[in-house]
Amino acid sequence: MPAGANGHIKPFSGAHQEKDSTVKYRICSLAAAVTLTVSGACAAADSVAYPDKPIRFIVTFAPGGGTDIFARAIAVKLTEAWGQPVIVDNRAGGNGNIGADIVAKAPPDGYTILLTTNATIVINPHLSKLPYDPVRDFAPVSQVATLPFVLLVHPTLAVKSVPELIALAKAKPGALNYGSSGGGGGAHLGGEMMKTAAKIDMTHVPYKGAAPALVALLSGEVQFMFVSILTATPLIESGRVRAIAVSGLKRSPALPNVPAVAETPGLAGFETDLWYGMLAPAKMNPRVVDKLYTETRKILFQPEFRNRYEPTGTQMVGSTPAQFAATIKKDLVKWGEVIKTANIKLE
């Protein structure tokens, strides 16, 4: 730049000044456009206009079971909170594999969500070849609740405790049938773990969900089975079945007079439990995942919701997506070891 007589810098003028102004204008215009675009995108992402249409909950078991009951309760509350219908779509079969595969292949837009159990996500991978990867193909939203199983027997079966059941099975090898909500589920594993630990011979009969399995138990088609405490409680109270044990390491506060299987001599350390989890297709917008998690957690800890389900022995969890992802990885290792040690295989 040329200097004036007083030594100060003279500004450009004429063509130079016009060119400089044009460049500055273009730069400012571009900056403004970028700013508007970025701020607009950020505003859209932050607001997440979700949901703006009905949401479908894929439940991996038949209507009437614990997973279905819990999913419908959450769906009702989400519908109330968001003003959009949350529709439960039961896709039973393959111990949850059919429904899980639907969600794994669904668009990651937040409108197809999986409600399932640990059987589908952390047990099935050790027992059969799956069309989905439990870690790679899903975005964990929240582990919503955990609960023990209850060992139920048909009231005509002359046993009132696990030791008596084992004694009967030993006296009549192969004569007793036990049901489950599907091969490879926690109820199936519970039966196989008991079979291995107690060295007894009994036959596993899998069904497509807890509801049809319970029908079989009530009709006497099977003599006993492990059932989630949520599903079992009303049947126990009605006297239609007899509870002889719970599957946790300790007794459940909901059934304080029912011993744990682990109290049985020779079965110390016995434990099989159930959790309900919410997952979405992989690569879903993290803000949508967080919105779904946040609203679900609010529902789980509403006094009305807790008062309805915690007396049944259902423990609300409401874990974050990151916590749930860690639980899945941990439980994949845990159940892999259990299945290998007990040499459990699907029929």
What label would you give each PLM region?
Residues 120-129, 188, 193-197, 224-258:
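A ligand-binding cleft/hinge motif common to bilobed small-molecule-binding domains
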Residues 8, 17-20, 52-54, 197, ...:
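An extracytoplasmic/periplasmic, membrane-proximal ligand-sensing/linker region
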Residues 69, 73, 77, 98, ...:
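Extracytoplasmic/secreted proteins, especially bacterial periplasmic and envelope-associated proteins
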